[in-house]
């Protein structure tokens, strides 16, 4: 059976440091990573990186994907321009296709009502509370949280975010993911050999 691609949503001001660990190590595991932007237009990250997408976000369908990744962006907190991305996340979750959101994207999901009944985390509880959402009692103080098909994380936790994604998609076995996390998060030198051996590299 052909593996469906992972889709990374990009938009102007996206936080380019938040998804690199996840996309790089998904690609190393054989997953195709495709990018989608509003209107299929080129976009520019916070760091000034310009991206040409593979497709328009509006064309993206859950049945054609194995995961939707939503990075943070200043634009999540500057109006409703990214509300369509949150609605796309709703379509994915309704179809049982995983969604992974980090930083400001979690606020977008909160506004869409997608965190009201799911365990989640973000930059801080007050940040999400400011959206007026109804899920404050499901907030978890953790580096990253997976609840069913939804992964959430705060902006300082791109490695934990990637760990949850790699685990959710079964990109590597648990031993390999544990070694990978200790290498990239804890800077454990012993983990390098464990990671390369466990991952078959």
Predicted regions and their residues:
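Active-site-adjacent pocket-lining segments in enzyme domains
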Residues: 2-14, 24-38, 54-100, 104-201
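Short N-terminal binding/cap micro-motifs at the start of the first secondary-structure element
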Residues: 14-19, 44
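Short active-site-proximal "capping" loops at secondary-structure junctions
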Residues: 39-43
């Amino acid at each position: 059976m052909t593996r469906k691609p992972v889709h990374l949503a990009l938009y102007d001001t996206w936080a380019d440091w938040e998804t690199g660990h996840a996309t790089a190590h998904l690609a190393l595991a054989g997953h195709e990573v495709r990018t989608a932007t509003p209107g299929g237009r080129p976009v520019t990250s916070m760091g000034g990186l310009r991206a040409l997408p593979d497709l328009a976000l509006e064309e993206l369908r859950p049945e054609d994907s194995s995961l939707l990744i939503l990075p943070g962006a200043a634009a999540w907190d500057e109006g409703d321009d990214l509300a369509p991305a949150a609605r796309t996340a709703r379509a994915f979750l309704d179809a049982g296709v995983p969604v992974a959101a980090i930083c400001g994207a979690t606020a977008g999901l909160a506004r869409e009502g997608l965190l009201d009944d799911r365990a989640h985390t973000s930059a801080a509880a007050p940040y999400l509370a400011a959206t007026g959402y109804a899920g404050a009692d499901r907030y978890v103080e953790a580096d990253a949280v997976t609840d069913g098909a939804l992964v959430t994380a705060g902006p300082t936790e791109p490695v934990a975010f990637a760990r949850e994604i790699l685990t959710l998609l079964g990109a590597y076995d648990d031993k390999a993911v544990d070694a990978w996390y200790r290498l990239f998060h804890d800077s454990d030198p012993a983990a390098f050999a464990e990671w390369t051996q466990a991952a078959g590299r």
